[in-house]
Swiss-Prot record:
Organism: Streptococcus pyogenes serotype M3 (strain ATCC BAA-595 / MGAS315)
Lineage summary: Bacteria, Bacillati, Bacillota, Bacilli, Lactobacillales
Name this protein carries in UniProt: Isoprenyl transferase
Family: Belongs to the UPP synthase family.
Gene expressing this chain: uppS
Cofactor (UniProt): Mg(2+)
CC terms in the record's Gene Ontology section: cytosol
Amino acid sequence: MFGLKAKSTKKVFGGIPKHIGIIMDGNGRWAKKRLKPRVFGHKAGMDALQEVTITASELGVKVLTVYAFSTENWSRPQDEVSFIMNLPVTFFDKYVPVLHENNVKIQMIGETSRLPEDTLAALNAAIDKTKRNTGLILNFALNYGGRAEITSAVRFIAQDVLDAKLNPGDITEDLIANYLMTDHLPYLYRDPDLIIRTSGELRLSNFLPWQSAYSEFYFTPVLWPDFKKAELLKAIADYNHRQRRFGKV
């Protein structure tokens, strides 16, 4: 679709990250530069997400986790929050057919109880439509917060210890990972190899703090609506110049 096949790209790069996480930042600033309301940037960001998803799929990426809405984002202006909550409805209506055609499987992490009914219905419909697909997993972090995720996992583990389902000595890193929201992902791809943040901000903002322990980070000043295929390839090229040590020398 974008003129570059995964096979030829793999000859250029030493390796493709199997799991990429993206903090999609800069929609509001992108709109402001164009003298448009912030919501205009969020709408443009949907087009970037579609292109990045298809490109990642062509490259052989297994999981793409995108930070769509954090637990802290509820403090934004109500009209903006309402617009963002409607974005999944618009995005899935417009792009699920092409994502489905490209064998993309849609999943999510996050607390669903606070999501509007229309948002949740659109998300569940997209998940159901693509559930048998075997290609890239497009994993939406929606109403997600890393600290809340870990806190919830600790509560469940503590309850299982109280119920004598677990002994304290059974608690390992692997067991904790099984209580996190990413436990539905394939075991080998639960943790991101590469985390990308757009817009020039240099922080994680509560995105996958447990899973990113050994991730490589790529920060770019490019605003999210401008982060398209060429920018993703640039990020992966940079990743391929890294030596991943996983705490070793």
